[in-house]
Amino acid sequence: AQPSMRLRF
């Protein structure tokens, strides 16, 4: 399962 939104820092 993959998150729909990935936070990029």
Curated annotation (Swiss-Prot):
GO terms for cellular component: extracellular region. The modification Phenylalanine amide is found at residue 9. Belongs to the FARP (FMRFamide related peptide) family. The keyword Secreted applies. The keyword Secreted applies. One of its GO terms (biological process) is neuropeptide signaling pathway. Coiled coil: none annotated. Keywords: Amidation, Neuropeptide, Secreted. It comes from Penaeus monodon. This is FMRFamide-like neuropeptide FLP3. It is found in: Secreted.
